[in-house]
């Protein structure tokens, strides 16, 4: 068999003429080699993905799937808060710190990795409070859109206190606006916040550039906390729609950043909508479908819906639709009330007065079920998915001795809950529901 002759001549480079031999450029050949990371198996597998890892629709799909699946696999880790009384408000500061406010008027930060508690000094009014003053505690903590300022209650529960983030240095106190306790706060821009009070009014506060720069300058000169005092920019009373004006107390606020609209819930069972930009202008007031114990409100931007908690229902309101179109869902927690509510993706998380967390799927229009039967309160597969708070701490005071000593464990109302930025950690806090009982609960579900 004759062997075919094979030419060992190198192919001429493009552009070389006939009979010309191109030089072999070894340095150019080396420069064209793929970088090591592109030769890896990881790079090869990532190149085969159906969607790029930074594709927004793909990420939204993943977040939605996680939001629906995660509640069924969450496990609880309790924190010990000492003798603090009832955690009413909370917000994540970063991936490991949560700031909280209590009924005993304590502002503190808890490290969810170590459990360490750090108390933050609360800010005082221009004039000292009278000796007869009685505090209701800190009911609201809110962070502005750029996460540079935090607003909460002051030493006087009628006043709003603003801190700088991430240092929690004091910036200013807004005093002289309300005659009664502040129940809720909402930021309507990076420098403007609205407070809602038990006196039936809403106050608009502005942290001007002058206030912020002055605060920076004073902190640079003094080792003692120094802060400004500001007055409200606008003050509006909610409409007295009911026959009992005493119940016209602003209980909760939620802001729609897209339409610049502020929703407010009052204890007389009404929902109020305001245009909130440089001032507050009323748009509408409507009677709620369930008007007992309306103490919590949240806005879902993606769904253009307000969620309002009541004694046993969560009602979903779309201000663009007639009031009779509002949909309500029964939470099977008759008598204890809905104490906190929030949106994450298509899941509405509901905290109850009986220490339960429920999860409502807006798309499926039903509560999530326990698909495994492994949750603490589930007896059978397919039961309603319900997470129950731990024992917490309870002071066996005179109230407990007289009325509750025969009860082994008093459930802790979920007064506040919040997801971290990843949506994989849920901070839950509260305390005993009866007014005279003193106790606390805080836990991380992850």
Curated annotation (Swiss-Prot):
GO terms for molecular function: ubiquitin-like ligase-substrate adaptor activity. Keywords: Cytoplasm, Cytoskeleton, Nucleus, Repeat, Ubl conjugation pathway, WD repeat. The keyword Cell membrane does not apply. Pathway: Protein modification; protein ubiquitination. InterPro entries: Beta-prop_DCAF12, DCAF12, WD40/YVTN_repeat-like_dom_sf, WD40_repeat_CS, WD40_repeat_dom_sf, WD40_rpt. It is found in: Cytoplasm; Cytoplasm, Cytoskeleton, Microtubule organizing center, Centrosome; Nucleus. Residues 1-12 have a biased composition (Basic residues). GO terms for biological process: protein ubiquitination; regulation of autophagy; ubiquitin-dependent protein catabolic process via the C-end degron rule pathway. WD repeats lie at residues 132-173, 177-215, 245-284, 333-370. PROSITE patterns: WD_REPEATS_1 (PS00678), WD_REPEATS_2 (PS50082), WD_REPEATS_REGION (PS50294). GO terms for cellular component: centrosome; Cul4-RING E3 ubiquitin ligase complex; cytoplasm; nucleus. Substrate-recognition component of a DCX (DDB1-CUL4-X-box) E3 ubiquitin-protein ligase complex of the DesCEND (destruction via C-end degrons) pathway, which recognizes a C-degron located at the extreme C terminus of target proteins, leading to their ubiquitination and degradation. The C-degron recognized by the DesCEND pathway is usually a motif of less than ten residues and can be present in full-length proteins, truncated proteins or proteolytically cleaved forms. Component of the DCX(DCAF12) E3 ubiquitin ligase complex, at least composed of cul4 (cul4a or cul4b), ddb1, dcaf12 and rbx1. Belongs to the WD repeat DCAF12 family. This is DDB1- and CUL4-associated factor 12. It comes from Xenopus tropicalis (Western clawed frog).
């Amino acid at each position: 068999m004759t062997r075919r002759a094979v030419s060992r001549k190198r192919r001429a480079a493009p552009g070389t003429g006939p009979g010309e031999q191109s030089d072999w450029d070894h340095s150019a050949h080396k420069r064209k080699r793929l970088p090591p990371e592109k030769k890896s198996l990881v790079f090869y597998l990532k190149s085969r993905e159906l969607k790029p890892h930074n594709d927004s629709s793909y990420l939204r799909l993943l977040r939605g799937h996680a939001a629906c699946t995660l509640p069924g696999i969450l496990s609880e880790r309790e924190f010990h808060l000492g003798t603090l009384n009832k955690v009413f408000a909370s917000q994540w500061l970063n991936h490991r710190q949560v700031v909280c406010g209590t009924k005993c008027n304590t502002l503190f930060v808890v490290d969810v990795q170590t459990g360490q508690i750090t108390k933050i000094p609360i800010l005082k009014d221009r004039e000292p409070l009278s000796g007869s003053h009685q505090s209701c505690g800190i009911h609201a903590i809110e962070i502005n859109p750029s996460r540079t300022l935090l607003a909460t209650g002051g030493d006087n529960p009628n006043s709003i206190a603003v801190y700088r983030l991430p240092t929690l240095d004091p910036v200013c106190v807004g005093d002289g606006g309300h005659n009664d306790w502040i129940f809720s706060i909402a930021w309507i821009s990076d420098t403007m916040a609205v407070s809602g009070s038990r006196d039936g009014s809403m106050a608009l506060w502005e942290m001007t550039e002058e206030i912020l720069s002055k605060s920076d300058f004073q902190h640079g000169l003094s080792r003692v906390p120094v802060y400004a005092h500001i007055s409200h920019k606008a003050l509006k009373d909610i409409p007295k729609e009911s026959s009992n004006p005493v119940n016209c107390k602003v209980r909760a606020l939620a802001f729609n950043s897209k339409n610049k609209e502020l929703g407010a819930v009052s204890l007389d069972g009404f929902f109020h909508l305001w245009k909130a930009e440089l001032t507050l202008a009323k748009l509408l007031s409507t009677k709620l479908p369930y008007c007992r114990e309306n103490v919590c409100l949240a806005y879902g931007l993606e769904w253009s819906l307000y969620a309002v908690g009541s004694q046993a229902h969560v009602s979903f309101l779309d201000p663009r639709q007639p009031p009779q179109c509002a949909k309500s869902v029964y939470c099977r927690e008759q008598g204890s009330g809905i104490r906190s509510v929030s949106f994450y993706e298509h899941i509405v998380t509901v905290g109850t007065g009986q220490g339960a967390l429920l999860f409502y799927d807006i798309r499926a229009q039903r509560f999530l079920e326990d698909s495994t039967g492994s949750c603490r309160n589930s007896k059978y597969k397919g039961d309603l998915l319900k997470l129950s708070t731990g024992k917490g701490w309870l002071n066996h005071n005179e109230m407990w001795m007289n009325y509750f000593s025969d009860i082994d464990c008093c459930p802790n109302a979920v007064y506040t809950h919040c997801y971290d930025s990843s949506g994989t950690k849920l901070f839950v806090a509260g305390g005993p529901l009866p007014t005279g009982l003193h106790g606390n609960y805080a836990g991380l579900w992850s």
